[in-house]
Amino acid sequence: MKKEAIQKLVSPLSGEEAVREKLAAHLEELFSALAPEKMGEEYRAALRTENAPAAVRAAAEYFRKKPEAPLPDLRDPAGFDRERADRAVKGEMREVNVDWTFPGGKIDFLFDPTLIRGPRNHEWLWQFNRHSYWSDMAFAWRATGDEIYAKAFEKQLLSWIAGTDCPEKDWNAPGSAWRTIECGIRLLGSWQTAFQIFRRSGEVSDLALLLMLASMRRQALHLAAHPQSANWLMMECNGIYAFSSLYPEFREAEELRKLSAARVTSEMEKQILPDGMHYELSPDYHSVVTGCVLRIYELACLTGSRDSFPPRFAELAESTVMAAVRRSAPGLTQPRTNDCYTIPTAAFTGIAARTLPPRPEYDYINSRRKTGRPPEGKTASAFFPWAGFAVMRSGWEEDALYLSFDVGPLGQGHWHQDKLNINLYQGARELIFDDGGGQYEISDARTYGVSAFDHNTALADGLGQNRDGPRVSPEKIDAGWISEEPFDYAEGTYEDGFGPEKKKLARHTRRVRFEKPDFFLIRDELTSRDEREHVYELLFHLDTLRFTRPESFPGAILSNFGGECEILILPLAVAGEEEPTAVSGRTGAGMRGWYVGRNEATLHPALTVGRKSFPAKDHVFHTLLVPVRRGERLPEIALTGDTLHVTFRGKSRVLDLSALWKPEGEDGAE
């Protein structure tokens, strides 16, 4: 095809010579990359006569008439946001909870509003260039037939192709629209939805459709040439596999499909731990990776390429889903650990139910307990010996009591300095929270959100944990795990550094016992590692500003969420300790008392409860955590030495504070 003819075709699209040359280069690449034998006689005839306009018409006609792609989300979208589609048409955008309106609706895809409206967050531009709003615009067009969506889409698409380039280097740097993660997300997400739907609109030109295909090919080749790691690599493979499977008309399609299948299969073995958890130890990225894997597998099944994957592939995928099910909190969400927001467990089981062999556990989650059954086991609790999560639960009921205890490594990525952290739920209410660390911005809040100061663990001399590893445990973790009908028990130790200098100040051992189904007893042992005295402090975080201090329990804090359940934080054996503190909304160097949320919960003041020792080489904190229903009588407590007597809900228990792993004896603790 003559270059001059192609340049003439694209000349009406822009008055700038550089843009025309770029668009022409896209078309030239497209014509070279399409396999004529797969495109029909009309297209082949246009090539033989070097009739560029005819080739454009024939190629566009071919792709317009192709059957709908076998994408379940395309046929049955989980729902689309009509209001968001309308805003996007006008250039009104929102990313990472930051709004921006482009004047006159003229979008600059390389503009970052957080440069002028802080805090700085590179994710705004990156996530904006995932173009998820194009999916909303496409579904809005299909639902209404209003061509305003199609016209706006073409305008934005051509602007994006003209205005963004893949950098020769540092394509993953701030300000780039060609990060590999965005390319992967686009190629299975918004770009497929937009292409598959808008190709039916007469207001989207033939040239726009073909330029979009040419850009998709460029992005797929970019991903093939520059693989990254961890969850990024899975999203990259997702994009390559989607493009190569949905558009076999391209000469490279088969090679790209095999490359993607090989990469994702190899990475599954590396990234999925033997207990089914993803090695970044974040439910967010566990969900991302599981979704990528299952979407690739689903597409392979729908396009007749299941044999590209060994049986082990589906087994590993199932293990990731079942890990999420076993870890699910009573509200059928995942407890937030490392960088995270609230992830519904159905994000795993929904796609698993239509992709993997059926399991009653998937039905149980997807139906919200109406059908199916929960995981079977000796008890409802579970320990993940490679991830290091101890999950203690009273049962699988909607209002069950639940605690997640982290005794594991940092995680391969997105880690927080929070070993020995706990999350505590009664039903869907998170009584003691881990907020997930907030947006990926450059701010004091983000620094606080990933630090020990925003987690339910211990400080030494006002310094938080600071460790470099291990990111993944080289062997099974021994947490002394016990799970019996009367109680659960787990323990873990932190003995790495504190503060910016990673000083080896102290060793922190936490022991957690769940007296089913009513309360938790925690023993925190802080031991000096340098033979010096230190001030130790325990932190607990509650998403409320309201609380009381019960007169019957000196030093105790009782939350006031105003709901059906509250949490009583009751210090035991408080000799050698200051009066507990309760702080909200403090800023500056001693920041505490904040919920640093992401997506569903933005930054807001919360409550940090602190228990601080007087200077000592060693100190032991004992804490009783008792969820109490509204109007319920508080427990009766008596402590003699290490023997604790608790009477609550008509039942008396006798426990040994020095040996939480022991069963309760008939005549007291054994």
State the predicted function of each range.
Residues 1-92:
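Extreme N-terminal leader/anchor segments
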Residues 93, 383-385, 415-417, 451, ...:
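Short solvent-exposed loop/turn micro-motifs enriched in small/polar/acidic residues
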Residues 129, 236, 386-388, 418-420, ...:
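Residues that flank catalytic or metal-binding motifs in active/ligand-binding sites
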Residues 39, 49-56, 65-73, 79-86, ...:
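Short, solvent-exposed loop/edge-beta patches enriched in aromatic
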